[in-house]
Structures are given as C-alpha cells and as structure tokens.
Amino acid sequence: MRHNHGYRKLGRTSSHRAALLKNLTIAIVKAGKIETTLPKAKELRGYVEKLITRARKGDFNAHKFVFAHLQDKEATNMLVTEIAPKYATRNGGYTRIIKTRVRKGDAAEMAYIELVAQ
C-alpha cells in the first residue's frame, strides 16, 4: 500500500531518481522552461522550489547548499546570482506547470515546467 508515501518513484532506483531530478533542475535553471512528463514535472517542482528558497539568501552557505545538490558551477551561479534575487519578495510558487499533450509513442501526459517570470 502507498499510504502517506512522500515522493514519486518514477520507475527508477533511488540514485537514478536523484540524478534525474538533478539533471532536470540544471536544465530548467539554464533554459527557464522544459518539457517533460507530468509526474516528473510535479516531482521536480518541490525540488526546484526548495533550492530557490535557499538560494535567495545569496551568501556563501547558499552557494554551498545549491552546489551540493546540482554539482554544476554554471547552474549554481545562475541560480544564486541571477534567478533567486528575482524572487526576493515572493514566498514560494516560483514554478508553473502547464499540461501540453499526450506523447504519441506511449500515451504519457506531457507538461511544461517553467520558472515564473517576475
């Protein structure tokens, strides 16, 4: 039974799921908007929003925290110095999920996940 289960498995091992979320986060930070399956987008939303909330402080510890999760210098600098300051007065809700289509090959629901413009 799935009662009170805290996250989506996404059909992957825990390390594969962590790598997937990390790579999707790097992609959304660099591009601002990506298309993925709806369950991945819903799982990614919480991951990205926690990073943005920590990055809003902008200090050394924020850089360390974000880099520990992303392992990408370029994405870390973009998130802490460019993206997070835009949301300084916003309490959460940094991302938006828009359902787009049903993928032809496997009938998976697709969605855009994007950073909300300020």
UniProtKB/Swiss-Prot annotation:
Keywords, ordered alphabetically: Ribonucleoprotein, Ribosomal protein
Gene Ontology cellular component annotations, sorted alphabetically: cytosolic large ribosomal subunit
GO molecular function: structural constituent of ribosome
A UniProt-annotated Pfam family: Ribosomal_L17
PROSITE patterns, A to Z: RIBOSOMAL_L17 (PS01167)
InterPro entries tied to this protein: Ribosomal_bL17, Ribosomal_bL17_CS, Ribosomal_bL17_sf
GO biological process entries: translation
Superkingdom of source: Bacteria
Subunit structure of this chain's protein: Part of the 50S ribosomal subunit. Contacts protein L32.
Family: Belongs to the bacterial ribosomal protein bL17 family.
PANTHER family for this protein: LARGE RIBOSOMAL SUBUNIT PROTEIN BL17M, RIBOSOMAL PROTEIN L17
The protein's name in its UniProt record: Large ribosomal subunit protein bL17
